[in-house]
Amino acid sequence: MNLSDYILEFLRKKRVHNIFTITGGAICFLMDAFSRNNKLKYTSVAHEQAAAMMADSYSRFGPNFSATMVTSGPGATNLLTGIACSWFDSIPSLHICGQVNRYELSSFDKSTKKVRQVGFQETDIVSMAKPITKFAYQLKNENEIRYVL
């Protein structure tokens, strides 16, 4: 089982039934995993903020919490208003954002380069999301996924 399949299977076991998403290069492996998992449904939306608001509403009024999956850069930053909405009203939700390849990260190999100097659409979304979430984290390697989820 690869990491993308593991994430979707974890969400299924937590009774997440619908994930709101916009596809993008930084989450293409997660989107591919949907084709191998017929127990989860995803809803493709026109804007990431809509995905976050839909996840909030689904969690607020539905039987289970919901999630979003978006790509890096503007895809991630567009979630912030919806994340804040959930935060202010204590509505549970999970937001998974893609990021540039590990070797393109400004933090890779103790690089002295700043964010956005190496990777396409690299964004420090964790720093932006921390004030409006209970937990915001960027995986450093795939072995952390069990703890992070």
Language model features: what each stretch is:
Residues 1-149:
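N-terminal alpha/beta PP-like core and its mobile active-site loop of ThDP/TPP-dependent enzymes
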